C-alpha cells in the first residue's frame, strides 16, 4: 500500500509488536473515556460507547480494564481527550502527519517541539502537508485468519478499494471514509475477522530518499511514535 516504504519495510517490520499493540489499546481506552464524557456511562443509551466497548473486547482488552476505565471516565477529575493533528516536513521534503489523542494539548505540543529539536525536521502550518495525502477508511484483518487471495475477492465484493499487505500482522482493507461501516459489515457477513476499523492517511505520492536521509527520517518518525499521546504517524517516504 502507498505509505509503506523500503525504509518502513526494513526497519518498521522489526518494531516491537507489544509497543504497537499497546498504542492500539491506549487509543481505544482514550476513545472509551471520551465517549463517556460526551454521552454518559450507560452503553444502553450511548451508542458510541457501546461500539467502543465491543471494540475493546474484540481487541482482547480485559473486562476489568474496561470497567476500571468506565469508572475513571465518570470521575469529574478525569479530563476529556481531544484529537489533534500535527504536520511536519522531515528531511528531503518528506511529509509527516502525526495524529494524537490528548487530555493536555500544551503537553503534546511541547513533546512535538522536543522531537523536532532532537531529531530535526520542522513543524508546519495546517494544510502544508495534508494535501499530499488522502483520507481512507481501513479495516484491520488478522493475517492468520485468511489468505490474501481469498480476502482480495471479498474486498472487491464488499465495496473496498484496495488491499494493503505490508503490515506483519494485519491486512488493511481500504475504502472511502464514508463507506467504512458498510464495508466492515459486508466483510463480517462473509466471515472475515475485523480486529479494528478506523480512518488513516495514505500518501498520494512518494518521495525518494538516499540512505542517510532515510535514516534521519526514521529517527524522527520513531521519536514521534514514542510520544505517549501519539496514536499514529504517517509519512510519504518511498
Swiss-Prot record:
One of its GO terms (biological process) is regulation of DNA-templated transcription. It is found in: Cytoplasm. Belongs to the TACO1 family. Residues 1-21 are annotated as: Disordered. Pfam families: TACO1_YebC_N (PF20772), Transcrip_reg (PF01709). Residues 9-21 have a biased composition (Basic residues). One of its GO terms (molecular function) is DNA binding. Keywords: Cytoplasm, DNA-binding, Transcription, Transcription regulation. The keyword Cytoplasm applies. The keyword DNA-binding applies. Gene3D superfamilies: 1.10.10.200, 3.30.70.980. One of its GO terms (cellular component) is cytosol. This is Probable transcriptional regulatory protein CTL0717.
